[in-house]
Amino acid sequence: MNWKGCLLPLALPLSVLVIGSWRLAVFDRPPPSQPALTGSAQDLRPNYAQAPPGTYPTCQDDPALADLLLAEGRRLGVTVRAGQPELPGKDATYRAEPGRLGPITIKQRPMSPVVRCMLISHEFIHVLQHLQGDLKGVLLLGWSTAHPDPIPQEAEAYGHQHRVGYVLSLLQATPRTSAN
């Protein structure tokens, strides 16, 4: 990594990060209700960087697992709502918020159960990336991918969005914070 890559995180405040794009911060949010992970919660969480094994069900195998992802998200404090995603042309977005899990917004449109599953799994990979960054940033999990998206977090999510069973297992192993 060159010196410019080291300085990039300092040049871009976290409040303007929306997965896949940079945007202005939203200042009319309610006060944070979910603190950053404490030391003990960090110790109990799974290893998000562990590469997905091929032993878990995929969206092709069981697209209904998307509903379990949504339930785990609610347990952890992720708000999922229907509406217009923050990024133009996207069917869903996750907004990483400093110090707490953010919301997922999903566009309501007809889609097959498998596509819906991959869409939801994709957004929860961004949740895992946010957890990997201790709710302070959105870090790569380190799962290898050949997906060509120029944004590394997006490439990682697109490259593994079919791995719903593994994403679900990581969310199920993630402890709730004390505010939940």
Placement of each model-derived feature along the sequence:
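Alpha-helical transmembrane signal-anchor/signal-peptide segments
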Residues: 28-38
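N-terminal Sec-pathway targeting helices
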Residues: 1-13
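Auxiliary, metal-adjacent structural segments of Zn-dependent hydrolase domains
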Residues: 17-20, 24-28, 42-104, 109-113, ...
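Short active-site segment of divalent metal-dependent hydrolases/proteases
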Residues: 121-129
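Long, well-structured alpha-helical subdomains associated
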Residues: 162-180
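Post-HEXXH active-site segment of zinc metalloproteases
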Residues: 114, 118, 130-159
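Residues that scaffold the ATP/ADP-binding catalytic core of kinase and kinase-like folds
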Residues: 73, 127-128, 160
